[in-house]
Each structure stands twice: as C-alpha cells, then as structure tokens.
Amino acid sequence: MKDPSRSSTSPSIINEDVIINGHSHEDDNPFAEYMWMENEEEFNRQIEEELWEEEFIERCFQEMLEEEEEHEWFIPARDLPQTMDQIQDQFNELVISDSSSLEDLVVKSNLNPNAKEFVPGVKY
C-alpha cells in the first residue's frame, strides 16, 4: 500500500524552501532569530510619540467641550419672550427717531442723488 504523504501529487520540497523558526535554512547569521530587536528603540520611540499625540488630541477635545459648556448659548425657549406682554414691552422700548436726524444723514451723505435706483437682476 502506498503512503499518501509520498504521493506523486504532493509538491516536492526543495532545500531552499525549508524554513525553520521563521528563517530560511541558509541563514548563516546566528543572531538572525533576534534581528527583530534591532530597531526596538526606534519602535518604542514611535509608539511613545503616538501615545503622546493621542493624549494631546484627547486634551484638546476635553478643553473644547469645557469651552462649549462655559459659553452662553441662545436657547429660544429660554431667551425669546413667551407672552404678548413681553413682546409689547420690547416693542415699547424701541426708539422712533425724529426726522431731523434723517435730514442730517441726507446732508452728510456721499451718495449720488441723481443715480438710478438699483433693481436686482436688471442690467443697465
């Protein structure tokens, strides 16, 4: 009976393809197994920078949230008048200017009184 592991359909193993402990058999460097540690300090520095950056971003977001909480926001339900009396009081507080101040504005104006009236969408 034939051994199935030695069947002719299985690929042949070439010496160059044999890898032991993650390294090829031809590796003559006795420290090849430890070469991943070669750049360990650089890797640690990079990870530390990423952690500092994440912490900085987190602090920025926290400060931004605190500023938003401190800021006085316009809330219509709270800030707009609710009753007709409040609206009437605000309306009464409005000052109606007299016509003499309007005449002063016209006299001091730099506008051309002979200019055509501006109408949006009309080309002259």
UniProtKB/Swiss-Prot annotation:
Ubiquitinated, leading to its degradation by the proteasome. It holds the Pfam family PAM2. Residues 22-75 are annotated as: PABPC1-interacting motif-1 (PAM1). GO terms for molecular function: mRNA regulatory element binding translation repressor activity. Keywords: Cytoplasm, Translation regulation, Ubl conjugation. Belongs to the PAIP2 family. Interacts with the second and third RRM domains and C-terminus regions of PABPC1 in a 2:1 stoichiometry. This is Polyadenylate-binding protein-interacting protein 2. It comes from Pongo abelii (Sumatran orangutan). The gene is PAIP2.
